[in-house]
């Protein structure tokens, strides 16, 4: 990696660490959302650097839908144990009672009940006034216009027309009782930055990001990896082993794989250099309707 690129990554690292420390000093009860993906892994690594040699001054929160890949759950628990992090796991009890699932109820309802409502329940339950998230501006157009400190009202709603200025890296974290801030320390990073930093810092990631032979089927223009037996095959569908990996991770019925032979970090980085599509092309929830991500964020989604 050339010196110019290395300096760029260190500048991003310094900015993110500054934001994380600022939130820890300014807010009474912050939390770090941990979705187990590559961005969460980088964000956790930066947080550990920010407070080294001490421990994290806030817990990790995973809003569990019950439909993550099995490798993600194993990685989550191993990571929390390895680093001695306090891990909070919340699953929407009403959604569980109604047996909400993406196959029967669709991606929009599943996401709203198990993710958005589940997140709001957890934030209310523990009284968190600031929540870190790993979203980046290059991922999606609604995230591109969101501030690093994203103000949310007492119902956790985001109003894109009522955002606060962030001049010269000065962040306004003043809130009233019941209000909160979502904080995005990786806002200025790109997917390429994330992968190069993972390689530079030797950060462990879920193996699903690396290409391997996996059982997949084609459905609705997406390569779906069959992770357990909760799927009913439709007429003509056949499960086949193919060399695939994931650019983004979520609930397995709603996350498409991509055909790839990139089995190492340098190979992934090389693959990203020639990619012309967004990593979120494989996320079914982004296809629900035009502007679906912004609508979800207005309702309280991260």
Swiss-Prot record:
Heterodimer composed of CysD, the smaller subunit, and CysN. Belongs to the PAPS reductase family. CysD subfamily. SUPFAM superfamilies: Adenine nucleotide alpha hydrolases-like. The keyword ATP-binding applies. With CysN forms the ATP sulfurylase (ATPS) that catalyzes the adenylation of sulfate producing adenosine 5'-phosphosulfate (APS) and diphosphate, the first enzymatic step in sulfur assimilation pathway. APS synthesis involves the formation of a high-energy phosphoric-sulfuric acid anhydride bond driven by GTP hydrolysis by CysN coupled to ATP hydrolysis by CysD. Pathway: Sulfur metabolism; hydrogen sulfide biosynthesis; sulfite from sulfate: step 1/3. It comes from the Bacteria. GO terms for biological process: hydrogen sulfide biosynthetic process; sulfate assimilation. GO terms for molecular function: ATP binding; sulfate adenylyltransferase (ATP) activity. Keywords: ATP-binding, Nucleotide-binding, Nucleotidyltransferase, Transferase. The gene is cysD. InterPro entries: PAPS_reduct_dom, Rossmann-like_a/b/a_fold, SO4_adenylTrfase_ssu, Sulfate_adenylyltrnsfr_sub2. It catalyses: sulfate + ATP + H(+) = adenosine 5'-phosphosulfate + diphosphate. Disulfide bonds: none annotated. It is an enzyme of class 2 (transferase). NCBIfam families: CysD (TIGR02039), PRK05253.1 (NF003587), PRK12563.1 (NF009214). This is Sulfate adenylyltransferase subunit 2.
């Amino acid at each position: 990696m050339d010196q110019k690129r290395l300096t760029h990554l260190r500048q991003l690292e310094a900015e993110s660490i500054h934001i994380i420390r600022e939130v820890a000093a300014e807010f009474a009860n912050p939390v770090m959302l941990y979705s187990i993906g590559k961005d969460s892994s980088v964000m956790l690594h930066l947080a550990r650097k920010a407070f080294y040699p001490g421990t994290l001054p806030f817990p990790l929160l995973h809003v569990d839908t019950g439909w993550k890949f099995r490798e993600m759950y194993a990685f989550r628990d191993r990571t929390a144990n390895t680093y001695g992090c306090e891990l909070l796991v919340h699953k929407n009890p009403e959604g569980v009672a109604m047996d909400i699932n993406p196959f029967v109820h669709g991606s929009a309802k599943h996401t709203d009940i198990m993710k958005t409502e589940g997140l709001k329940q957890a934030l209310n339950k523990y009284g968190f006034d600031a929540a870190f998230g790993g979203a980046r501006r290059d991922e999606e157009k609604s995230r591109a216009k969101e501030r690093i400190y994203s103000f949310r009202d007492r119902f956790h709603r985001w109003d894109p027309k009522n955002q606060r200025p962030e001049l010269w890296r000065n962040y306004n974290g003043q809130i009233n009782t019941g209000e909160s801030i979502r904080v995005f320390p990786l806002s200025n990073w790109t997917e390429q930055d994330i992968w190069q930093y993972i390689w530079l810092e030797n950060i462990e990631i879920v193996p699903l990001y690396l290409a391997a032979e996996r059982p997949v089927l084609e459905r609705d223009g997406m390569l779906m990896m069959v992770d357990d037996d909760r799927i009913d095959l439709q007429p003509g569908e056949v499960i086949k082993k193919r060399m695939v990996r994931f650019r983004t991770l979520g609930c397995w019925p709603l996350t498409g794989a991509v055909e790839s032979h990139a089995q190492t970090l340098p190979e992934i980085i090389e693959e990203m250099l020639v990619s012309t599509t967004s990593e979120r092309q494989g996320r079914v929830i982004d296809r629900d309707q035009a502007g679906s991500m912004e609508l979800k964020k207005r309702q309280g989604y991260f």
